[in-house]
Structures are given as structure tokens and as C-alpha cells.
């Protein structure tokens, strides 16, 4: 059954619903059951407004986003606006920023995207998916530049990973091994695309988003000649050539490229080339002669003197040593949010966090409300990101200017790991 479904998915990726504009009118988000078509089968999922993934929201920088959430679920819920710089009260994190929206109640999120340093974002609904047996839902939020690059198409690609049972429906069984190993990985992968056709010679922008709970994707894209231009919504000062692209859960990559054939996305691990979906040729145009240029930089304060440092030890999991936490995973011998923040800083302080992965599994570590610099082995700052992937046995040091007041979560974005202990927070006053 699963092999047959995988073959049907390989014939074509699913299409995202048409985008919504939220520049002048509020958007209503209604979480509930939605049926996602994969291959020839409708699969019951959680969705926004009857679709999963929900239709993307598009805004320009300087817009005010207004989103009303009407909770018709049997559980409390929140909406977290992943990767965006926003007021702390709008971050959608239980305990730290707001109480859950109880069933049959509503809540309006309202914040400017003028200060956003991100160009492609993700809205996720952190439902109690481990209890309901259904995954959280996602909806892309695209924040466009005041003067976007001149492209023929701007295409969103949402990577998707799901575990199906023998009947081809969502597998509602959970195993302890899902929490203490690499996470709850699916047995079927695909891609939801906002467009599935392009002309030979088209100049396109492709926004790759990995919203999956636990899977790390390693992608090869056939049929494109171009460059990576942004990581996690932050423009790269120098273009990065297209090779195999690794995206941990919550990471994003922007690409600008020319179409040179059918555009096929392939997962290279472990199958070595499983087709996830594609953009098929329909017509032809002359390839542009102008070279691809980097995107305009976002305004980010450069760190001055480092005023605070902290160590974040990742502990636990299968094959890991003992730790002081109650869960399968821990940060610094604590499972779950500790009473005291990892760092308590004044606004605009530059801090450094040394992340030590003392486990047998990789972890994608995400900071809310900010971006940070990854550093190399010599301590030099490299890429601005909001999520960094730390391999087993690796130490990654990040530098961040904490210039957004509030209580901000720092956690593993392999959500099975977060649910079983990998979470802490920072306080900015």
C-alpha cells in the first residue's frame, strides 16, 4: 500500500491553496479537520480553514498583520508565528507569552511586519498533537520586500513528511522510540507547491520551507541553474551555489534560479533520489542575460562586546548518558522550561551561547523573536539564522544581539525532542 502511494506522490506534488492578502483586512484562522489529498487518497489532518497546509498569507514589509483565531477544537490552542520579529505578547507560546485559546473562544494577533527581518516565514499551530494523534498544522506567511526581485514566478515549496498506516491513513500510534531517537519520522514524503508549471527559461524564486515535526531533509533540485539567496529569511551577503541542500525542521532556504528543465525536488537520504514533487515545463521563453544578484540586506545590529556567555548542554536520548531531568531529553540537566532563564539580559546586549550536543542524534535549535550568527571553528561569524542544526558530538557557538524585549523560548525544533524535555528560555528586559 505505502509503496503504491509513494509512486502516486512521485507523479506530482500537491498544490497549495491560493494565497490571501492580509494588508488591509483581518485574516480569520479557524483550526479544524481538513482532508489533504496525497496521490489519490484524502487523508484526515488538522488544518486552517478546511485546508492543510492552509493557504499562504502574503504581506509587504510595513504592513500590519491582523489574524483572528477562532478555536472550534476540543482542545486549547495557540498560533506561533515562526521566525518573525514581533512583540513578545504575540509569539504564541503557552506559559511564556499567553494562555491557550480555550475551545469556542477567539483571539486576535496583531503586529507590524515592518520590523521583520524575515522574508519567508511559517505559521504553525502547536496543538497537543501528541495527545490527539494528529499533527499540528502549518500555513506559510510570506513577507515580501518593498521592491521584490524581478522574477517570472515566486513559488512556495512546503516539504511534507507523514506516517501512514496500512490503510493509507494517518498513523495515530505513537511509540516511545519516536521521542528518544530521531523523532517521529514518516514513511511518505512529498512537497506542496504554490505552482506546478513553468516555462523553460523562466527566472523564478523558490522558497523552500521545512515545517515537519522531526525530519531533516537533504534535497537535490534538478532543472534549475541559480543560487541560494537567503537562509531563514535572512539575505546572504554572497550567493551560495545550488548543491545538496540540508533543511532541519523549521529552516528555510530562498533560491533564485533559471528553469533549464523539469524542476524535480529529490530527497537524497536515505533513498538516494526519491522524487518529492516537481514543476513541469509548459512553454518556453528566452533566458535572461542579467546575472543573479544578492538580495538587499536586512538591517541587523552588529554585535559589540560580548557581555554574557552561556553553555547549553544537550543530553539524553537513546544511547545517551544519564542526566538530571525527568524526560527523555534535557538541556543542562533540566527537562522542560526551567524556572530561571538561560540568559537574562538588558535590551541590546550581545550574548554568546555555546551549544554542546552530547547525544547520538542531531538537534535543530531555534530561538524565538531573534536571529543569531552561527560561528565557525575560529569564532568568525558566518550565517544569520533563527534555527541551527547541531550534529551529534558537535559544538556550535552562536552570537546574538538580544534587542527584542520579552521572554523568548530556545528549544529543539525536532518537536518530539522538545515535547520530551529540550526547551529553555531567555529573558530580555
What are these regions (language model features)?
Residues 52, 56-59, 81-116, 191-196, ...:
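Extracytoplasmic beta-sandwich strand-turn segments characteristic of Greek-key/jelly-roll folds
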Residues 6-23:
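N-terminal export signals
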Residues 24-30, 131-165, 237-362, 401-407, ...:
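Extended terminal and domain-junction accessory segments
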Residues 69-73, 208-211, 355-359:
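Asparagine-centered strand-capping/turn motif at beta-strand->loop junctions
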Residues 153-202, 209-213, 324-334:
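Acidic-aromatic/histidine active-site loop/patch
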Residues 63-65, 202-206, 349-351:
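Structural beta-strand segments of beta-rich domains
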Residues 39-61, 184-196, 321-347:
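N-terminal edge beta-strand
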Residues 75-82, 215-222, 363-367:
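Short, hydrophobic/aromatic beta-strand segments
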Amino acid at each position: 500500500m505505502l509503496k503504491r502511494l509513494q509512486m502516486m506522490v512521485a507523479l506530482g506534488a500537491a498544490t497549495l491553496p491560493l494565497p490571501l492578502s492580509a494588508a488591509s483586512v483581518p485574516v480569520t484562522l479557524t483550526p479544524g479537520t481538513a482532508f489533504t489529498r496525497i496521490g489519490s487518497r484524502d487523508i484526515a489532518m488538522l488544518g486552517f480553514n478546511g485546508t492543510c497546509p492552509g493557504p499562504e498569507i502574503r504581506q509587504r514589509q510595513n504592513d500590519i498583520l491582523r489574524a483572528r483565531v477562532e478555536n472550534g477544537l476540543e482542545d486549547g490552542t495557540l498560533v506561533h508565528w515562526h521566525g518573525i520579529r514581533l512583540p513578545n505578547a504575540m509569539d504564541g507560546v503557552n506559559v511564556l507569552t499567553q494562555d491557550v485559546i480555550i475551545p469556542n473562544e477567539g483571539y486576535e494577533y496583531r503586529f507590524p511586519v515592518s520590523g521583520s527581518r524575515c522574508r519567508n516565514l511559517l505559521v504553525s499551530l502547536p496543538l497537543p498533537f501528541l495527545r490527539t494523534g494528529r499533527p499540528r498544522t502549518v500555513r506559510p506567511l510570506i513577507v515580501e520586500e518593498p521592491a521584490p526581485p524581478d522574477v517570472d514566478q515566486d513559488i512556495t515549496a512546503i516539504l511534507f513528511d507523514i506516517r501512514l498506516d496500512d490503510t493509507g491513513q494517518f498513523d495515530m500510534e505513537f511509540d516511545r522510540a519516536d521521542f528518544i531517537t530521531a523523532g517521529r519520522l514518516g514513511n511518505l514524503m512529498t512537497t506542496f507547491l504554490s505552482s506546478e508549471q513553468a516555462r523553460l527559461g523562466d527566472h523564478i524564486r523558490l522558497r523552500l520551507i521545512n515545517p515537519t515535526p522531526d525530519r531533516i531533509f537533504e534535497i537535490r533540485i534538478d532543472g534549475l541553474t541559480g543560487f541560494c539567496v537567503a537562509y531563514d529569511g535572512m539575505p546572504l551577503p554572497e550567493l551560495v551555489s545550488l548543491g545538496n541542500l540540508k533543511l532541519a525542521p523549521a529552516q528555510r532556504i530562498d533560491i533564485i534560479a533559471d528553469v533549464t528543465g523539469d524542476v524535480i525536488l529529490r530527497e537524497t537520504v536515505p533513498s538516494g533520489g526519491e522524487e518529492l514533487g516537481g514543476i513541469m515545463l509548459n512553454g518556453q521563453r528566452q533566458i535572461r542575460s542579467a546575472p543573479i544578484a544578492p538580495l538587499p540586506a536586512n538591517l541587523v545590529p552588529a554585535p559589540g562586546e560580548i557581555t554574557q556567555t552561556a553553555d547549553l548542554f544537550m543530553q539524553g536520548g537513546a544511547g545517551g548518558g544519564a542526566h538530571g531531568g525527568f524526560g527523555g531529553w534535557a538541556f543542562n540537566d533540566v527537562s522542560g522550561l526551567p524556572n530561571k532563564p538561560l540568559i537574562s539580559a538588558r535590551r541590546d546586549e550581545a550574548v554568546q551561547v555555546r551549544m554542546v550536543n552530547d547525544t547520538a542524534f542531531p538537534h535543530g535549535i531555534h530561538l524565538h523573536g531573534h536571529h543569531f550568527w552561527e560561528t565557525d571553528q575560529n569564532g568568525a561569524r558566518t550565517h544569520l539564522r533563527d534555527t541551527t542544526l547541531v550534529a551529534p558530538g558537535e559544538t556550535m557557538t552562536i552570537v546574538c544581539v538580544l534587542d527584542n524585549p520579552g521572554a523568548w523560548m530556545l528549544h529543539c525544533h525536532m518537536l518530539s525532542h522538545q515535547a520530551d524535555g529540550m526547551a529553555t528560555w531567555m529573558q530580555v528586559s
